[in-house]
Swiss-Prot record:
Residues 257-322 are annotated as: Left-handed coiled-coil (LHcc). Residues 28-301 are annotated as: Surface exposed passenger domain. Residues 1-27 form the signal peptide. Encoded in an Atlas prophage region of strain ECOR 9, upon UV treatment bacteriophage containing this gene can be isolated. Belongs to the autotransporter-2 (AT-2) (TC 1.B.40) family. Eib subfamily. It is found in: Cell surface; Cell outer membrane. It comes from Escherichia coli. This is Immunoglobulin-binding protein EibA. Residues 342-392 are annotated as: Translocator domain.
Length: 392
């Protein structure tokens, strides 16, 4: 890949020719035109270098490939630092990448030195910029996503994938679903606490009622002991039975026992009703306990799904870094230059903690036509490319 690049700096005081390249100064930026296939000043790309912060950006020139974008910035090549790194953001906005380019690095260092000879030696070509644009465009289109099976769960194997959704969308859905389950569980716990309180109140009432029936049973026993000696009992104004002595109203002992039995029957009925309510409350508690157990299992299933999703995310991240390393290695392969000759080249590339090795061959048929092919390997994965170049 040629390192030639035409620098143009237009001066407000003069317009001259230096090394066959015109140049100008606009504000603090210096503009450069990429060399075309004839090693002359091209009109497809313009590079603007800022000597103050040692950064650069590449714009379309007056004869850019897309007519409506001519003389406008190229978004993917708008952030270049002093070391030749291009910063881009993935298509889904989730990840920022830094792509290194050797030719851009050499040019940035030469431009920073301000030495004309160094700049002339490290000039870029239009082909350099095309290759760089293709690399960053391919990386920018990468999107971290999650594969789902037909039931909406994270797919275990590629064959089970029925749908792909962005990672942010899937995590938002899982978070909302987990919140709903947690809220339902909390509501069930609140109802259970309320029922427990009601049960305690019923138990207290039952205890008080039992005390009253014990007293009534004692009174009945005392009355039965005196039946043989007394045939009458007194009846007070509130309907209770008293000793016949001194009472205004009296009834037979048998009638008194019947009246007393009716009262105890009503008490027994009240106790039975309370027992029924206690039984229903106990059943409700058991039902709620089962619901809590079911919700607990649901939460455990969600936890397992999140663990599976995290493993998938980690694998996608590793695969992305291997792909970036392979892309970097393939970019380092050289294109054949001499007509009628084969060339073989090898290159290494890396991204983050992943590395890749690439090998390739090429053949130039004539001055205008050349072809090359390459393959890159990284941790068991492989990627390849084949290209044909026509110059006209």
């Amino acid at each position: 890949m040629s390192k030639k690049f035409t620098k143009a700096v237009l001066s407000a005081a003069m317009a001259g020719v230096l090394f066959g390249v015109s140049f100008d100064i606009m504000a603090a930026e210096q503009s450069y035109s990429a060399l075309n296939a004839q090693n002359g000043a091209g009109s497809i790309y313009k590079v603007y270098y800022n000597p103050d912060n040692k950064t650069a950006h590449i714009d379309w020139g007056g004869l850019g490939d897309v007519e409506k974008e001519r003389n406008k910035p190229i978004p993917l090549l708008s952030k270049i630092d002093g070391n030749g790194n291009v910063t881009i953001t993935s298509a889904d906005g989730s990840t920022t990448f830094t792509v290194y380019d050797k030719e851009v690095h050499d040019f940035m260092k030469a431009a920073a030195s301000g030495k004309t000879d160094d700049i002339k030696t490290n000039l870029l070509t239009e082909q350099n910029i095309r290759d760089l644009y293709n690399r960053v465009s391919a990386i920018q289109q990468m999107e971290t996503n999650v594969g789902l099976d037909e039931y909406g769960n994270v797919a275990v194997t590629p064959n089970e994938i029925k749908e792909r959704v962005s990672l942010q969308r899937y995590l938002a859905w899982e978070s909302a679903n987990s919140t709903i389950v947690a809220n339902e569980l909390e509501a069930q716990k609140g109802k259970l606490d309320a029922q427990k309180g009601e049960l305690e109140a019923q138990k207290k009432n039952l205890g008080e009622l039992t005390t009253r029936t014990d007293k009534i049973d004692a009174a009945a026993a005392a009355t039965a002991a005196k039946v043989e000696s007394r045939t009458l009992v007194g009846v007070s104004s509130d309907g209770t039975l008293t000793r016949a002595e001194g009472a205004k109203n009296t009834i037979s002992v048998n009638d008194g026992l019947v009246a007393l039995s009716g009262r105890t029957d009503r008490i027994d009925a009240a106790v039975g009703a309370i027992d029924g309510r206690v039984t229903r409350n106990t059943q409700s508690i058991e039902k709620n306990s089962k619901a809590i157990a079911a919700n607990t299992r649901t939460l455990q299933q969600h936890s397992a799904r999140l663990d599976s999703q995290q493993r998938q995310i980690n694998e996608n991240h590793k695969e992305m870094k291997r792909a970036a390393a392979q892309s970097a290695a393939l970019t380092g392969l050289f294109q054949p230059y001499s007509v009628g000759k084969f060339n073989a080249s090898a290159a290494v590339g890396g991204y983050s903690d992943e590395q890749a090795l690439a090998v390739g061959v090429g053949y130039r048929f004539n001055e205008q036509t050349a072809a090359k092919a390459g393959v890159a390997f990284s941790d068991g994965d492989a990627s390849w490319n084949v290209g044909v170049n026509f110059e006209f």
